Amino acid sequence: MSKAELKDFTFKSRHIGPTNEDEALMLQHLGYENSEEFISSVIPNEIFDSENNVVSIPDGCDQNKALKEINIISKKNVEHRSLIGLGYHSTVIPPVIQRNVLENPNWYTAYTPYQAEISQGRLEALFNFQTLISELTGLPISNASLLDEATAAAEAISLSLAVRKNKNANKFLVDQEILPQTFDVLKTRCEPLGISLEMFENNNFEIDKNIFGILIQLPGKNGRIWDPTKIINDAHKCNAIVTIAIDPLAQVLIKPMGEFGADIVVGSAQRFGVPIACGGPHAAFFATKEIYKRQIPGRIVGQSVDVEGNQALRLALQTREQHIRRDKATSNICTAQVLLAVLSSFYAVHHGPKGLKQIAENVVKYRSNFESILMNLEYPIEKYSAFDSVDVYCSEASEVIQLASEEGYNFRVLPIGSDFENAKGFGVTFDELTCDEEIYTLHQILAQVKGKKAHDLSNFLNENASLVDIPLREKSWLEQSVFNQYQSETDLMRYIHSLVSKDFSLVQGMIPLGSCTMKLNSAAELLPIEWREFSSIHPFAPHAQLAGFHEIINDLENWLSALTGFQGVSLQPNAGSQGEFAGLLVIRSWHQSLGEGHRNICLIPTSAHGTNPASAVMSGFKVVSVKCDEYGNVDLEDLKNKSKIHSKNLAALMVTYPSTHGVFEPNIREMCQVIHQEGGQVYLDGANLNAQVGICRPGSYGIDVCHLNLHKTFSIPHGGGGPGVGPIAVADHLVPYLPGHSIIKCGGEKAISAVSAAPFGSAGILPISWMYIRMMGSDGLRKASSIAILSANYLAKRLDPYYPVLFKDPNGLVAHECILDLRPLKSQLGIEVEDVAKRLMDYGFHAPTISWPVAGTLMVEPTESESLPELDRFCDAMIGIREEIEQIKLGKIDPINNPLKQSPHTLKRVTSDDWDRPYSRKEAAYPLPDQEKYKFWPSVSRINNAYGDRNLICSCPSVQDLEDINSV
């Protein structure tokens, strides 16, 4: 077999949908002879990297070779049993959940459930998650996940600030037992907003009218628990909002914090069946009172009804969010941790309230038994009530930690952040994996250090240990049927699949969402993240034990630097929104270092992603909008005028490239020069980087800092709305300001404080992007970008006669996505863009992005992974819908009772006995030829969005609630 033939079996050919023959046909359709001629017509000459000199990235390889290489790297991580705690705990993911959810592309390749009619399964799993959190916390409103516990705590400060009664109050107090990584992120959030962040000790503080909120960590970082009633009452006396950061496993036993009077409760659901994975990804949660439902950050799943009166779920209260409210949004959160929330919700379904209680009680028992062992061996310990942890300060600390390490255990080094050689004490945290044998091993270690003999464990094991010094949960909880009827694996497996059968993902077909890059997430890329060498590692483990992770991180930093033309990268931000925040803070710190901290104006085009203005406000900047011209480009004259007007205070320009209008703006280099001449910096939103990789480099045409979405461009799956990774790449002068961390050394010499709880963010999924880049190589990455652009232009050319493409460059071309203008259909026939989106479901497609960045349009992004037949199938669907619209125009179809207005059509409706439509059942359900062979059915009809917001229900009713309802 020739070398040319072998190339067809490389990963590149598996990842890229169109074959070489397909590519030639598409180029011919567009009037080009070869891909280089085509790409040079799309990319402005002044930024086009015609040589593709990314020499630091190895050549692409097949899947087996890459898997062998990363397996060798993984073995460099030392897999010790972690008893470090500090918010990260070993847990068991039930195999039935691992197999049927985590490893199932139906779950991990779906997108955020904006199209609710084809997302009912995922929405139900998230509804269960919200119910779980509400039951744990005793608060009625919970969101569908946040990025990590530290971010959730920071969002609590934002909510507290927004609803404060004394608008001059600027002081927020935090418990001295707060997790150090959480305090780190709180400092980052508070400083740009002028919030005074102070610690209080011994559960006491002075009542002060300038305090607008307090945060209590309960249990504390050392596991301590106590009754927070008094401090909550004291805080409320000065009108302060009370946030409590909880451990969900401890909360299984403890009286819900909402019943103590807490206003907000946050935490991480990691203990509920999600691996530590060197710090993430994990689903955080945020619960609050009913009165704050319109200020809560992140997405909320709410109950509504469809047009036929059937119960349905949807994303509720979206007007709070950044894609609508922009700089006035409650948060900049977009991507969250949906897949991880789904895992945790199924973990709770699997165990039920009895199983969760047993796990929690075992933790309490082993902690109590270990304390007895310490006392027997005469280790000096401070007696206090605690859930899972013990801290010991003693002269033998270094020896204990060293011996434990030799036996395969990692203890917490005290003070936190110290090396074991300088340890003043050690801490141990117990978890779901703790067992009698482990306690005996720890007993032997401690006895050996004291020169004593370990005694029979029966002297210390107390099966009846319980929590004291805090009221416990008395009422029944998690009584909802979903948490009590799926404890057998057969039933749970069937329940999981009953949900996923309601969801549209890449398994069912193309998801052509503009600005979302729904490309292939290959099986080979995902395999390593489940290996214990990656999944079991604690982020605060000794540096030498993380050699494999450091190699992955270093490779990615170098590769991403080379691909973007920058000199430094931080992988810490765990979503694009946090990348924006981090990048803007880096710019802010650089200005401050020059004595120009007064620079606070951020110019943002009106077409920008909603996260841009929201992130700018969070970073302490004032947003000034820049107009766009009729061609979708940033209005260069308006940019120059605004830059001049705000010259003394200009901090930055935030720009997306290619633009959110789907074109490569020819003046990008000049735009950068305009900003630099006035002393500002240029921030690039990397949401559209999939059109640039290997073709042009932002660092080479004037950009100073850029965030990248590894969950878009570099193949990490969207997971139905997370996880994500949003690293930032920066020019040389900004490298010293890359984010640091209070426990693990990272970042620049003048680092801003952390933007995520873990030093390397969601490190557990970085192997996915490592595999993608390693297998694609520089040529493959360039090819992927080229095909992504080609596919978008092919769609644009085919669909332009039916739906005008709104923005094109001077050559009549688009970038990697295009905007289809449906506005004339509304003005002429009353056909809404939503009608077309819902009708696409009947044709077997997820809709493109709706009404953004221009109302009444569809933004289509096919990516490089979709084959030519799939692209044609989508075009046929859109053309078929246009023909249906033409029938309405000609008066052959009723303007209201037609396939578009009545879409989507469910199996239940199509097979009902009372079909009363003037069109046939076949026209409703099988509009494309051969659809009878395979059909994805929406599980509900069109949902009433307004009803859901007016009647907000975001958790399952309890048995008592149902009884109360039925008695009315």
From Swiss-Prot:
Pfam families: GcvP2_C (PF21478), GDC-P (PF02347). Its EC number is 1.4.4.2. The modification N6-(pyridoxal phosphate)lysine is found at residue 712. GO terms for biological process: glycine decarboxylation via glycine cleavage system. One of its GO terms (molecular function) is pyridoxal phosphate binding. It catalyses: N(6)-[(R)-lipoyl]-L-lysyl-[glycine-cleavage complex H protein] + glycine + H(+) = N(6)-[(R)-S(8)-aminomethyldihydrolipoyl]-L-lysyl-[glycine-cleavage complex H protein] + CO2. Its cofactor is pyridoxal 5'-phosphate. Keywords: Oxidoreductase, Pyridoxal phosphate. It is an enzyme of class 1 (oxidoreductase). InterPro entries: GcvP (IPR003437), GDC-P_C (IPR049316), GDC-P_N (IPR049315), GDC_P (IPR020581), PyrdxlP-dep_Trfase (IPR015424), PyrdxlP-dep_Trfase_major (IPR015421), PyrdxlP-dep_Trfase_small (IPR015422). SUPFAM superfamilies: PLP-dependent transferases. The glycine cleavage system catalyzes the degradation of glycine. The P protein binds the alpha-amino group of glycine through its pyridoxal phosphate cofactor; CO(2) is released and the remaining methylamine moiety is then transferred to the lipoamide cofactor of the H protein. Belongs to the GcvP family. The glycine cleavage system is composed of four proteins: P, T, L and H. This is Glycine dehydrogenase (decarboxylating). It comes from Prochlorococcus marinus (strain NATL1A).
